[in-house]
Curated annotation (Swiss-Prot):
Organism: Maridesulfovibrio salexigens (strain ATCC 14822 / DSM 2638 / NCIMB 8403 / VKM B-1763)
Protein name: 4-hydroxy-tetrahydrodipicolinate reductase
Record-linked Pfam families: DapB_C (PF05173), DapB_N (PF01113)
Binding, NAD(+): G8, A9, K10, G11, R12, M13, E34, G91, T92, T93, A115, P116, N117, M118
InterPro entries the UniProt entry points to: DapB_C, DapB_N, DHDPR_bac, NAD(P)-bd_dom_sf
Chemical reaction(s) catalysed: (S)-2,3,4,5-tetrahydrodipicolinate + NAD(+) + H2O = (2S,4S)-4-hydroxy-2,3,4,5-tetrahydrodipicolinate + NADH + H(+); (S)-2,3,4,5-tetrahydrodipicolinate + NADP(+) + H2O = (2S,4S)-4-hydroxy-2,3,4,5-tetrahydrodipicolinate + NADPH + H(+)
Annotated localization: Cytoplasm
Keywords: Amino-acid biosynthesis, Cytoplasm, Diaminopimelate biosynthesis, Lysine biosynthesis, NAD, NADP, Oxidoreductase
Amino acid sequence: MTDVVIIGAKGRMGDTLVRCVQQSDDLKLAAVMERSGCEEGLDSLGCVCGTDAQEVLTKVPGAVVVDFTSPAATLKLLEIASVTGNPVVIGTTGMTNEELAQVEEFAKKVPVFLAPNMSVGVNVLLKVLPELVRMLGDAYDMEMTEIHHNKKVDSPSGTALKLAQCMAEARGLVYDEVKKHSRDGIIGARTKDELGVMAVRGGDVVGDHTAYFLGPGERIEVTHRAHSRETFAQGALRAARWLSEQKPGKLYDMADVLDV
């Protein structure tokens, strides 16, 4: 039995995670956390609940923390978890390179897993897309689009950035040098190596990502569509089960969990 702590338990993702843990045969809801002023009703879950991470984590030693919040909140949580020893599964997106470097430092002290998207399908794409890049060669232009609900605060999505990065690297390019997150006005023709990553926001779309390979006389589109947040929740809980048996030393990702 793996004990789990859900951060942001009353949010869209947190609520889904709580429900999935409650329905699981091998997971136990050890604790839940929310921001001050948002904790009303949490005590009905029958576990440790609170707004102070230090206080909550001290009461549930060894429990795996699952966090889908914000970069600042995640880093604060990691600082506390590195003292209490709780492993942490991170689904937070929108981190800067500097923030990611801090996460890697914390991973030396406590088991940490980080993935912008925890669905099995997206992580299969991370393996498939580089193969397509290599087979098609540089005669095909590469682009990426993503669609998310109108409440998403970061753009482009962490998943789109990760997919585009793996495509760029497969062609021997440095992503930060070729990325194009917007096009506006008379900007001239598309350069040979640039890789556009464009975002659409609206409605209640859980998450669509499409990679484009546009060549002479044809194009290939590879799309992943998430129909439910439960896809991400189950992936995060799969990671939590796995992380509970790991040691600190490296920043783990979904490739480690899936052994691919």
